[in-house]
Regions:
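Edge strands and adjacent loops of beta-rich recognition modules
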Residues: 1, 80-114
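Short Pro-Gly-centered flexible turn/kink motifs
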Residues: 3-6, 122-138
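Conserved, well-structured core segments
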Residues: 23, 120, 184-186
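Beta-strand-rich interaction surfaces with strong enrichment in secreted/lumenal proteins
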Residues: 41-42, 106-109, 119-124
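Structured secondary-structure scaffolds
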Residues: 170-186
Length: 186
């Protein structure tokens, strides 16, 4: 598997504003309710620009985050102290939110957990856009690559697919609506 991911966010407001993108990788929590379930692991890698993932049945993967300003790790476990007033994990899953919103010391400085977010901070002017790229691969020693050719190929393939299925007589607006409708079916 080799997935290239591109996320674009645009400031639609009238003022310059900070934008925080936090693409997140996590494992479904099955270990806390099944005593014999192994606990998977996410850990910082690639000089702080990648997350290595290890799972008993899913194997090993790497999420490469070349433009990340930081990697935040917590455990994908409920905050028992906040919800029930009982002790829980040192770094519960809401730690990413608490770090971003309140500046709290709620992420694991050791760079490991079962949930990780790649922090991308951008200051955008009105109408300005920021694009980040990520790569999720089973090549555990992989590095960031220029994904532009991959995206160009996939966009050409998508254009060819829709051209073969949409009536040529449709105007561009209706074609865009039809493409969105098809995408909702995938």
């Amino acid at each position: 598997d080799d997935l290239h991911i591109r996320i674009t966010a645009t400031n639609r407001g009238p003022d310059t504003a900070m934008l925080w993108l936090l693409p997140t990788l996590w494992f479904r929590n099955t270990w806390s309710w099944r005593r014999d379930a192994p606990k998977p692991r996410l850990a910082t890698a690639g000089a702080g620009k990648a997350i290595d993932a290890e799972h008993d049945t899913l194997g090993r993967r790497r999420l490469i985050c070349p433009d990340a300003d930081g990697l935040w790790f917590v455990d994908n476990e409920t905050n028992g102290r906040r919800l029930y007033g009982v002790d829980g994990p040192a770094y519960p899953k809401d730690g990413v939110n608490d770090r971003l919103v309140h500046g709290a010391d709620t992420v694991n400085a050791a760079g490991e957990g079962t949930k990780a977010a790649a922090l991308h901070e951008r200051r955008l002017g009105p109408g300005e856009a920021a694009t980040i790229t990520l790569r999720l691969t089973d090549e555990v020693d992989a590095r960031a690559v220029d994904a532009a050719p991959v995206f160009a190929r996939r966009m050409a393939e998508a254009d060819a697919f829709y051209a073969s299925r949409l009536p040529a007589a449709l105007d561009d607006d209706r074609k865009a609506i039809a493409r969105q409708a098809y995408a909702g079916l995938l």
